[in-house]
Regions:
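Amphipathic, non-membrane alpha-helical segments in soluble helical-bundle scaffolds
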Residues: 1-4, 36, 66-73, 112-115, ...
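Polyanionic, low-complexity intrinsically disordered segments
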Residues: 71-72, 87-144
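Flexible secondary-structure boundary motifs
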Residues: 11, 19-82, 86-93, 97-101
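Short, hydrophobic, well-ordered secondary-structure elements
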Residues: 1-18
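Structural signal for well-ordered, non-membrane alpha-helices
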Residues: 7-8, 81-84, 126, 130
């Protein structure tokens, strides 16, 4: 729960970073339906700010960040939702008609080391997006 709260709070901080997004872009991001769509819009808008002609490189970086987003932000947020709805031992599917074995296994295998790994990877992910927004010419230097 703490990890997901940290991610959601730092997301809000990120999109409101001075000179990162315009007011119009922030409204576009916040208008998205759910956390996943908001993050995807944020990443896409961040890449739109780059002045590069190497579209293949941009596509590869965007794909990598989308994969990290899914694995280290969206999937853990779904586990948080299960815990918040009292599904501590057995996680149900979205319709609550049967057990979701994949999510149940993810929940059962959570430990301190994995959660610490989530925090570390998220911090790097967050910094990548921030660098795209703030350091247009040197964003690639530290992480990729």
């Amino acid at each position: 729960l703490l990890y997901s709260a940290y991610v959601e709070t730092s997301f809000l901080k990120l999109i409101h970073t001075p000179k990162a997004f315009t007011e119009s872009e922030i409204i576009q991001i916040m208008a998205e339906r759910n956390l996943e769509q908001k993050w995807l819009k944020c990443v896409d808008l961040a890449f739109n700010k780059l002045n590069t002609t190497n579209l293949g490189e941009v596509a590869n970086k965007k794909q990598t960040l989308h994969r990290l987003l899914q694995e280290y932000i969206i999937d853990p947020s779904q586990i948080r939702n299960k815990v918040a709805h009292g599904q501590w031992v057995y996680c149900l599917n979205n319709e609550c008609t049967k057990v979701n074995h994949d999510t149940t296994a993810l929940m059962a295998n959570l430990d301190f080391v994995k959660i610490e790994k989530y925090f570390c990877i998220y911090d790097k992910f967050h910094q990548c997006i921030l660098d795209l927004l703030i350091s247009h010419r040197t964003h690639y230097r530290d992480y990729y």
